[in-house]
Regions:
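Rossmann-fold scaffold of SDR-type NAD(P)-dependent oxidoreductases
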Residues: 44-53, 71, 100
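Rossmann-fold cofactor-recognition segment
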Residues: 18-35
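Short alpha-helical oligomerization interface
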Residues: 57-71
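Short alpha-helix in the Rossmann-fold core of NAD(P)-dependent oxidoreductases
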Residues: 52, 67-82, 118-119
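Canonical Rossmann dinucleotide-binding motif of NAD(H)/NADP(H)-dependent dehydrogenases/reductases
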Residues: 1-6
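N-terminal Rossmann-fold cofactor-binding loop
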Residues: 7-16, 31
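Catalytic loop of short-chain dehydrogenase/reductase
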Residues: 56-61, 83, 87-140, 147-155
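A conserved structural motif in NAD(P)-dependent oxidoreductases
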Residues: 156-168
Length: 170
């Protein structure tokens, strides 16, 4: 309650069915252009990274490169950016928070090898990064890694959980 929701998306703003389904602000961006989000990220208290693509069985070099870029490397750049912002503003009353939704593919096999590889990579990078932050840095930024389970979505059309069930658990 009382949150101002900013959506960062590659896609145009969808038509919301109700006001509750809609972000108050919609910012379009593309992988590789993370720096253009600096002014927006400076206003964010809680950043939730949840983007990705699922290439299915396509393992061509081009598809694997795109999957790694979208699912892992773009996340990594945004994590570093948000860390820098938090580190420069350590006097805040409340720490910033960074939530990274990796995937159940981080802990169990996925039908898509490229998806599994990319999600495991970002999961490992998040763990590695968190272990290298000082106590002072950890006080300025809370980092949370989410592994939500196999819920049905555009990325996982055969998921066994509903997104509503998973969201209630968080």
């Amino acid at each position: 309650e009382g949150a101002w929701v900013i959506a960062l998306s590659h896609s145009p703003r969808p038509q919301a069915q109700t006001a509750m389904d809609e972000a108050q602000e919609w910012v379009r961006w593309s992988c590789g252009d993370e720096r253009q989000l600096d002014s927006t990220l400076n206003r964010v208290d809680v950043l939730l990274l949840n983007h990705g693509i699922n290439p299915g069985g396509d393992q061509s070099p081009e598809t694997l490169s795109k999957t790694l870029e979208v699912n892992a490397l773009s996340h990594w750049r945004l994590i570093q950016q948000f860390e820098t912002i938090a580190d420069q503003d350590q006097k805040r009353e409340e720490p910033r928070e960074l939530w990274v939704n990796t995937s159940e593919a981080e802990i169990q096999p996925a039908l898509s090898p490229g998806y599994e590889l990319s999600k495991r990579l970002i999961g490992e990078l998040v763990s590695l990064r968190w272990n290298n932050r000082t106590a002072t840095q950890r006080q300025a930024l809370r980092l949370r890694k989410l592994i939500l389970g196999p819920f049905r979505s555009n990325l996982n059309p055969i998921g066994i959980l509903t997104s509503g069930f998973v969201s209630r658990q968080v």
